[in-house]
Amino acid sequence: LQHLLIGEVWLCAGQSNMVMPLNGFDYCPISDSNNVIADAPNHPGIRMVTIKPTVKLSPQEYAEGSWQQPTTENAPKFSAAAYHYALTLQRTLQIPIGVITCAWGGSRVEGWLPKEILQTYKDEDLTLIGSDKTPVYLQSMLMYNGILYPCHKYTIKGFIWYQGESNVRSSRTYAERLATMVKHWRSIWEQ
């Protein structure tokens, strides 16, 4: 083992704005990103891992992703929101910060909840999960099983969630489901 640090680990999850890398998307640049990327090696107290977007029908024990110390080569691929969050925490707290990014563009909050909770929602058609009738990013529970649940063994200080636009058509239920998601996530991380 090399380059180990003792500090705090945070989880950053959400949709496309959490996915957006430091170098931006095509035709969607990020202001001052070149300077932030050039400065990345000056932050040895930060570690980042992006969990590979994976959908699964059952909760997985392991996910794909490796911890990285920021360099000018790898920083452009880091989630911009997650990296800026890590920078702010590290500068403020003056301790090492690790960030786990679990994100999928366009996903709904239901994609980040387990089957046991989804079964209580009368408006959720769980028969569509795993089918080609609905785009994967809109399906319930798949991100939870393939991306989020495998990270529950990490000890984390907390988490941030960025977005909710894919739930715009279900705005009446979003607030309650977001609160349920937060409560469930806190329970699996024993917070």
Walk through the language-model features, giving the residues of each.
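Cell-envelope and extracellular/periplasmic
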Residues: 1-191
